[in-house]
């Protein structure tokens, strides 16, 4: 079969689905299907009447922009068709069955891609469609390369009945088998409803496009029918809802082009598979002292500050790539580089809810820690945590079990793990945030660190309650006892005496200490008990 590229006269009018491939008898055969980046509105190609056996197949933009040097993806299964003749499907046999699958390179690294095409039967998933996706996942597993899914589907193809559900299950099973073995990314380029949402949910990272992507198990019409609640698709499952309320999506972008660029950037921090190290960049050692870190933490322990300024002062310039930016903002997670090497950053954010741990912050942190541990990415923890968020809402919704997820994730992680305590480290939250006792390799503290069971005021009210009750001036007595407790514990030295902290360091020397410590831990090897 000869494959010819269509040269478009008006690329500005081409849709995001507007990459066209003509199968016919003209021109020399090509060894691959070249995917060309196109954008914007629909464009149709007029076919000559005398061309034999011509099929027009629109490939979505999604798989296009990933390849190196403008070269796209080498397509597999381009001639696959569905095998159903029920409910008019016999008249809708389109080559590829609504999904493009293939492989290519990004920054010289092998990747596998599947890209659903909503213009073909609504991107609906059925037997042949699912078989193409499962094949590309199997190949990604065999060759140890990342998998990228570009989702744009209305759900199951109901004309094919139960085989559509079987196809979903085949994909889900492979997503689970690949979890922690190869990195998996899901880019939502359009609607994703019903069973279609569960494959992205099983992958490592989900990306959405504002005003274009939608994810929901049941759509607005079903919600209205069952619950009589009126809600728009955007309100129910748009990028904003999932980035701020549910936490389903890890990244949101204004358009598909910026999403593709974000995906490339994310790939630069992660390895090909669980047996490889993450990619590093050349780095020339120099003066690693960072004076900018000296004055970030306020003298008043109750005054907030932005932990992102601390992160920026420690890691290589402009390398911090935040994950889940708008969800559970009291916890910061993301990738960065330290002396050219990829690291995962987990940090409390004192500027939001004082940096407390709550349900969402705990699950957000735990998921990120487990990803980094699966793919050999060292962990840097920056700690300023006053405890867990109190209240009936938290208790009734499972702060105990959800808080334990972060504890579990750190405890089972075998990658190099270093903690820097910048200020507060109180109570159970101190234990959870990669403490020495749950396997942290190195723990540093700034002179401003306070490592204690609780804050000075609360501790004084409990320990000295009889003295305070008996005092004529209760407020003055409380202040006196609060100062007494603070003098004893509002510093890092008592913990250092016990060996819970390896060194008390000045803020400006943090970067230098971390570079040397992570270098020392490069060959760390831990074998956990077999399960």
Locate the predicted segments by residue.
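Intrinsically disordered, low-complexity segments enriched in glycine and mixed charged residues
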Residues: 1-71
